[in-house]
Amino acid sequence: MRPDMIVLHYTGMPDATGALDLLCTPGSEVSAHYLVFEDGYIVQMVEESRRAWHAGTSFWAGETDINSCSIGIEIANSGHGYGDPDFPKRQIAAVTALCRSILTRHTVPPERVLAHSDIAPARKQDPGEKFPWRTLSDSGVGHWVKPAPITEGGALLTFGHRGDTVAAMQGELSKYGYCIAVSGTYDSATQAVVTAFQRHFRPERIDGIGDESTRATLRELLAQSGRVRTIAARAHNLERLATS
């Protein structure tokens, strides 16, 4: 396996020890490469070269077998079902250091450091809106832009809306990598994807509504992603010229 994706999860269980037991029980049919405890202690359960069962039914940028191309990191946090606690700073420092270490061994583009909810928006919420994606990005892990400010007024795309503006947003979400049909109808699947996007990139308000803040943040992510790919391509071409 040559992973080109990192997927971050929360355990969603009352305590880390119980999560570790579950992840190490063959009959549970769930596993991950790493588990990061609240105090920053890291346990590796599966070698990075081997496939772990952490993604489930999922999709990103045309890929449906996420388990075969990703490294899964479980973060000990009881999640939405148990009070939605904050992530301790030392735990986030450990997650960041682990991801940076993985990036030295594998080529993982920033936009392929993802939440479980990004790749399975209809099923999953983790690691949730309290996960500090900006902190990771500031350390060179993942993709982040400053969210566009939330303002009252403007066009709001909500369940049942139809039209070109809906189709345009669906197309942009699909281009970024999400599993979404460009139908022009704001259906429940679109609502789930928008909610997942907000959890990751616009966590100030999670409502599944395609407001101007959400759409502007998405457009800036796409623009920045395009610039990063252009710079990477130029660097690759220069490297080829230098060695030819």
Please place each PLM-identified region on the residue numbering.
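Short acidic/polar capping segments at secondary-structure boundaries
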Residues: 78, 119-120
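Cell-envelope/ECM-targeting effectors and their regulatory/trafficking segments
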Residues: 56-59, 88-114, 120-244
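Active-site-adjacent loop/helix surface patches within enzyme catalytic domains
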Residues: 4-111
